[in-house]
Amino acid sequence: MITINIDGLDQTQRYVLRIIERGGDLSPVFSDMGEHMVNSTHDNFENSTSPDGEPWAANSEATFASMLGASDTNQSGRLNRRGANKVASKQPLIMNHTLMQSIHYEAASAGVTIGTNMVYGAMMHYGGTKADYPHLWGDIPARNYLGASNHDVTILTDLIKNHLIE
């Protein structure tokens, strides 16, 4: 039994059900969908926005403090040029691109899953408070990086339509 759960994608679901009824192998289209969503998620990281275009919360002072060392300040403790450049160029969720590069998909004949295997990925996506997670150095705001934008939905629907035509 194949279960399809694509919230808000009624037309897309109808296309997928037509493919299933025709006995078609869905793994190629699910692979194309996964590839698209990985690329779209990478764009979310590069633009520091959620799939719906909402800007992510800015980095906190704790984030900046954790990335700065003695070579980033002058003798009075103020940021030097190197430290100021680090702070100015630091995007949320991007320190060394590890989380972004961990985004992958797994396609099968019954569906596609997009996500990360990084343990901290859920915390970065959903956020968390020090009250709920005492080991945190402070509250972490939600920065949604996974999900489909309206543009993604259009592309995913087109991928399915094209698969139906082939």
What are these language model-derived features?
Residues 1-166:
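Short, Lys/Arg-rich flexible segments
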